[in-house]
A protein has these predicted regions:
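Long, charged amphipathic helices and adjacent flexible linkers at domain junctions
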Residues: 30, 89-123
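Short beta-strand/loop segments at the ligand-binding rim of alpha/beta enzyme cores
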Residues: 30-48, 131, 152-156
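Conserved, mostly hydrophobic/aromatic
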Residues: 4, 40, 62, 147, ...
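Catalytic cores of alpha/beta
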Residues: 1, 43-65
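Glycine-rich phosphate-binding active-site loops on the catalytic face of alpha/beta enzymes
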Residues: 3-10, 59-82
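Active-site-adjacent beta->alpha loops and helix N-cap segments on the catalytic face
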Residues: 12-27, 79-89
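Nucleotide-binding motor/catalytic cores of P-loop/tubulin-like NTPases across gene-expression machines
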Residues: 143-145, 151-189
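C-terminal binding/interaction regions
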Residues: 190, 194-196, 204-217
């Protein structure tokens, strides 16, 4: 779901925009829909090498509201400082997530689907056993999005046999993705997880990892 700041500003009185934005993001998260906040995020950087403090707060608040991504438009397409704009936005996002990820509001409703219940249980188990990673096998991306919306601070990796889904996961909060072969048995899934994590130097023998799958293999 795109949330265009300028469109809300046209359709609503300005004083209503912040609350409507927060509610829109919350609603999308509840239904496991990715949210991209866009338009005029760092508008002043079209002609200035530094953003205004209000713009910095706008970008940071998009993260704290629970958005998956933010998007630049005129700042990089016609602006005088496209590289600096991207660098500054990245710094704002990284700093906000590093210092304020625990301030992102939790979902206010209980899961209504089997997939939602499984991902919630997986997060609770992972946090209880202090797992190093949560690994999600998905063919459509739905399980990864349901996991992402819970905003766990444990690193999450989505394994998928679909390259288009792997690319799409780059816009899902907190999800790294890996392309794997389609397998016929859960033991093969565990082998793929071991091969990826150990091969990338991300885990070692004895590390705990929670693995879930959106559908049975085969």
């Amino acid at each position: 779901m795109f949330k265009f700041c300028i469109d809300l500003g046209v359709e609503l009185p300005p004083e209503q925009v912040p609350i409507v934005q927060k509610k829109a993001v919350e609603y999308a998260r509840r239904w496991a829909k990715p949210v991209i906040v866009a338009t005029q995020m760092l508008e002043s950087m079209i002609s200035s090498p530094v953003p205004t403090r209000a713009e910095v707060s706008d970008v940071a608040n998009a993260v704290l509201d629970g958005a998956d991504a933010v998007m630049l438009s005129g700042e990089t397409s016609v602006g005088q400082y496209p590289i600096e704009t991207v660098q500054i936005m990245a710094r704002i996002l990284e700093s906000t997530e590093e210092r304020g990820a625990d301030r992102i509001p939790p979902l206010g409703t209980k899961p209504r689907t089997q997939g939602g219940a499984i991902t919630l249980a997986a997060v609770e188990v992972a946090e209880f056993v202090e797992a190093k990673f949560i690994c999600i096998f998905t063919e459509s991306g739905d399980s990864a999005r349901r996991m992402s919306r819970l905003r766990s601070l444990i690193p999450m990796i989505a394994f998928t046999p679909e390259d288009s889904i792997r690319r799409r996961m780059s816009l899902t909060w907190g999800i790294k993705s890996a392309l794997v072969d389609r397998v016929q048995h859960t033991d093969e899934m565990y082998h793929q997880v071991d091969e990826y994590l150990m091969g990338q130097g991300l885990a070692k023998d004895g590390d705990k990892v929670v693995v879930i799958s959106g559908s049975p293999p085969g």
